[in-house]
Amino acid sequence: MKKLAVIFPGVGYTCTKPLLYYTASMAAERGYEIIRLDYGQDIHTFHGRTPTELEPIIKLAIKRTLPQLENVPFSEYDDIIFISKSIGTTIACQLETALQLKGKVHQFLMTPIPSTLRYLSDINGLFFAGTADPYMPESKIHAAARNFPDKTGGIFEGCNHSLEQKGDTLGALKNVRLIVECLDKMLV
């Protein structure tokens, strides 16, 4: 069985940070080929966070990501999972459509941004969010969980955009472990 995991980082949250590093490691352990995307250093150091500021950054990231994926023979894979964080969640959902992979991809969305929520009705997958995420209002997180209970992987009370609580290293490690265990259940 041929399997692929594509890793979509956030703005400052690169593929070497804990949530993406360990989810990619688990996918590799389960026999998935790993593609780690890079949007460019200017995007990884971008400081804007409002939807208006993020929209052109997302478009630029997609423009830079498409060439990294255009020669991937997606039809040859038996299972494809998009593992994403922050703006990567919106990029992953948009690319599922742009690459004509609707229904062929499992989405694993960590700390989605508000623009990702509109895709929840169309995806096959799970999302994970913290209630103290400064980029996602808590009310939107709970509404998404109510509207899409089968797509809610976990809501982390009091956790920020990295699914951590300041000053609680052991709690952060526990959250990473819980997320990796959820991913492991999705992998074939």
Give residue spans per PLM region:
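Acidic catalytic loop of the alpha/beta-hydrolase fold
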Residues: 131-136, 161-162
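C-terminal alpha-helix
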Residues: 178-188
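Catalytic histidine-centered segment of alpha/beta-hydrolase-like enzymes
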Residues: 159-174
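Short beta-strand/loop motif that positions the catalytic acidic residue
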Residues: 121, 127-129, 133, 141
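Primarily recognizes the serine-hydrolase "nucleophile elbow" in alpha/beta-hydrolase
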Residues: 63-122
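Serine-hydrolase catalytic machinery in alpha/beta-hydrolase-like enzymes
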Residues: 2-76
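Active-site nucleophile loop of the alpha/beta-hydrolase fold
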Residues: 10-11, 39, 107-116, 130-132
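Short alpha-helix in the alpha/beta-hydrolase fold that links the catalytic acid
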Residues: 20-21, 136-146, 168
